[in-house]
């Protein structure tokens, strides 16, 4: 069955692309020919993240259906300034965004960017240009409270500290698709 429903994996790919765009837009990637490593983003389950010095990881937490009326953004017209009310239902997903940085004593200086700094930068991105970019793909973001950044010591030997903040997004799905799935899963039982 073909649907426009964004699966968790599809949403994750869009979030990874969005964060990569943040790194490019905010010039957090090293200049061409530089030996310095830039920030990278990948899914939480990838084992290769231990090889990176500066990394952002995405960890899916939960999803909730928040209602049959939501907002659909004008992605078809490439218009991200208006949202049209439609009878879609919204799935509200919560992702944890982890920022990690390998710290060596020789690295620390006045201009050293910590994992807390990167978490603050990404929150600003998701509350601004990043939200606009996600709207182009039909994903709405909820404002992030900056007080929700949690910083703790990482148990691994590679990273001494980790900053984590929750990212809540809303993903619409056509109600007709949802109703057909309900009837598939529960034959003979129909929603009122």
Locate each region found by the language model.
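Small/polar-rich, solvent-exposed N-terminal microdomains that initiate assembly or binding
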Residues: 1-81, 191-192
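Short, charged, solvent-exposed linker or helix-capping segments at domain edges/interfaces
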Residues: 68-71, 176-184
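Ordered, soluble secondary-structure elements with a strong preference for glycine-centered loop motifs
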Residues: 5, 9, 112, 116, ...
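Short, cationic low-complexity segments
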Residues: 81-87, 181-192
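Generic recognition of flexible, low-complexity loop/linker segments
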Residues: 44-45, 84, 153-154
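Oligomerization/assembly interface segments of phage tail-like spikes and tubes
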Residues: 86-112, 120-122, 160-172
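Intrinsically disordered, low-complexity coil segments
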Residues: 25-39, 101-118
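Acidic-leaning, charged glycine-interspersed low-complexity segments
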Residues: 117, 124-177
């Amino acid at each position: 069955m073909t649907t426009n429903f964004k699966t968790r994996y599809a949403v994750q790919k869009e979030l990874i692309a969005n964060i990569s765009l943040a790194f490019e837009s905010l010039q957090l990637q090293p200049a061409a020919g530089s030996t310095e490593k830039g920030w990278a983003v990948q899914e939480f389950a990838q084992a290769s993240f231990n090889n990176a010095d500066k990394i952002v990881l995405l960890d899916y937490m939960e999803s909730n259906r928040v209602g049959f009326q939501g907002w659909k953004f004008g992605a078809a017209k490439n218009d991200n300034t208006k949202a049209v009310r439609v009878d879609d239902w919204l799935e509200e997903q919560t992702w944890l965004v982890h920022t990690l940085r390998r710290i060596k004593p020789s690295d620390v200086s006045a201009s050293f960017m910590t994992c807390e700094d990167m978490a603050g930068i990404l929150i600003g991105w998701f509350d601004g240009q990043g939200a606009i970019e996600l709207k182009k793909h039909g994903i709405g973001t909820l404002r992030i409270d900056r007080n929700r950044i949690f910083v703790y010591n990482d148990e691994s030997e590679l990273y001494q500290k980790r900053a984590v903040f929750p990212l809540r997004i809303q993903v619409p799905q056509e109600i007709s698709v949802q109703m057909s799935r309900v009837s598939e899963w529960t034959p003979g039982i129909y929603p009122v």
